[in-house]
């Protein structure tokens, strides 16, 4: 009985860690990559979808904001 509770607790903790990592790390990084490559070529519907995903995954995006630069190439002095 105690072993079942321990195993189910580990499963729940592992699931929370997996979903938290997915929400805070992997999906925001994929979203940054998508925005960086498609920013100048997006249509209206795609841009609306991206804006809604930015709203949904804002906590993860704000974690990576200090480390990523989304300025266009060729801006500024060399």
Curated annotation (Swiss-Prot):
Main location: membrane
Keyword annotations of the record: Membrane, NAD, NADP, Plastoquinone, Quinone, Thylakoid, Translocase, Transmembrane, Transmembrane helix, Transport
Catalyzed chemical reaction(s): a plastoquinone + NADH + (n+1) H(+)(in) = a plastoquinol + NAD(+) + n H(+)(out); a plastoquinone + NADPH + (n+1) H(+)(in) = a plastoquinol + NADP(+) + n H(+)(out)
GO molecular function, one term: quinone binding
Membrane topology of this protein: Multi-pass membrane protein
One cellular component term from this protein's GO annotations in UniProt: plasma membrane-derived thylakoid membrane
One family name in Pfam for this protein: NdhL
Disulfide linkage: none
Cell compartment(s), UniProt: Cellular thylakoid membrane
Transmembrane segments: 10-30, 48-68
EC number: 7.1.1.-
Subunit structure: NDH-1 can be composed of about 15 different subunits; different subcomplexes with different compositions have been identified which probably have different functions.
Function: NDH-1 shuttles electrons from an unknown electron donor, via FMN and iron-sulfur (Fe-S) centers, to quinones in the respiratory and/or the photosynthetic chain. The immediate electron acceptor for the enzyme in this species is believed to be plastoquinone. Couples the redox reaction to proton translocation, and thus conserves the redox energy in a proton gradient. Cyanobacterial NDH-1 also plays a role in inorganic carbon-concentration.
Family note: Belongs to the complex I NdhL subunit family.
Name listed for the protein in its UniProt record: NAD(P)H-quinone oxidoreductase subunit L
């Amino acid at each position: 009985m105690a072993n079942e509770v321990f195993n189910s607790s580990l499963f729940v903790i592992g699931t929370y860690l997996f979903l938290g990592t997915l929400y805070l790390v992997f999906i925001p990084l994929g979203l940054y990559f998508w925005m960086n490559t498609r920013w100048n070529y997006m249509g209206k519907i795609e841009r609306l979808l991206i804006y809604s995903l930015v709203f949904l995954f804002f906590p993860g995006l704000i974690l990576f904001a200090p480390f990523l630069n989304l300025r266009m190439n060729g801006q500024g002095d060399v």
